[in-house]
Amino acid sequence: MNYRIITYIVGWVFNLQAIFMVLPILTAVIYGEKDIFAFFTAIIICLGIGLPLTRKKPSNKVFYIKDGCVAVALSWVVLSITGAIPFVLSGSIPHPIDAIFETVSGFTTTGASILAEVESLPKSILFWRSFTHWIGGMGVLVFLLSLLPLAGGYHMNLMRAESPGPSVSKLVPKVQSTAKILYGIYLGMTVLQIIFLLLGGVPLFDTLCITFGSAGTGGFGIKNDSLGSYSTYCQVVTTIFIILFGVNFSAYYLILTKKFKAAFHIEEIRYYFGIILASIILIAINTRHMFSGFAQAFQQSAFQVGSIITTTGYSTTDFNQWPALSKTILVLLMFIGACAGSTGGGIKVSRIVLLLKAARKEFQLYLHPNAVKKIKIDQKTVSHETLRSTNIFLSVYLIIFCGSVLLISLDNFDLITNFTSVAATLNNIGPGLEIVGPMGNFSSFSYLSKSVLIFDMLAGRLEIFPLLLLFFKNTWKKF
């Protein structure tokens, strides 16, 4: 374990957090709010810890995957705790656990909230709450990699630990260049959505907050009804962008480099759009009697399907009142999630495709025991290591899911609330059903249950293993 480089990286996360908080201070100044002190205090704390840790570069830059996982997990814990300080000091969320819940939900792009009334919050707090989605969407360590040569030739171990999906690949030979490309695409798409929303007459502050949530696939709304009170134009634009942010970003790089055929032949993306289209049509047919016509049912269905499968969590209607078939489809989409290499959460479409192909292979072996069958995705043979890691991931995922449902059941809420609460947090979605539906929140849970759900949100965003490593004694051995 290279403790020095880990503390150096975590120190830079403290420094970055201080820089990030400058924007909500500017927001407070613009709107004449008194919450500047809360953010200034948080900045002083962050710099007071971060600057000493980054004053001297580490001499030993050997950095293995275990070090990367620990650095990433600790960095996200640091983001969560320091990010909660303004909520507590401003009085917006007085209790530390509630504040950490809200902050973790923001950075992990979950969008689950303990707040029943968000419209009364100061603009600076609302801005910070939404901005955490954008920061966490692509990953703060990936952002750090795009700025600083942190770990010599060992960048990939850091990127692999934070990036979602069963495997992580470089777009170009240099990892730092890959990180810059990813953030360039991320920023470019963010600016595009801002422009489109402004053209539709959406106020600038609302535009920024909605876009931060869309880009990070987060879902914190600044209205009590999420996006329900905005125009159809705003909802349609947001639908398109949240679906686009759920696509593997490598496809956009291929398009930018004019490799159109390769981009449109990515198997995961074809499944992704196929699942979305099928779900939209089924739900639109099932809910058509609840709207003024099929066109409106289709539009509302498209928004909710896009929001759930990408794990954004915005809503334009109370789908808690939808028929059982529609709600069942949405719950299934919670688990499927977005594409690997996107800002979305969930199990990921690539893993679902892999499981389906593995199941088909096993079925074929029953019929033809001597046949030699290989699993291929995008014309490439999937390695046994990838299959093994996928199976282990799903096994641990199931254990955490069941354990979390059992623990929060101590609060004596109904099964659907408990089940979808864990599904919504472990898959980084936000709203569930019943008490935690799109018009509800997580405030009713005990602090024990909120702590469990905080763990689930972090585990879901970090794909479980980096966070779990913190709890193993062998992780902390020097050699």
Where are these predicted regions, by residue range?
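Membrane-proximal intracellular helices of multi-pass ion channels
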Residues: 1-479
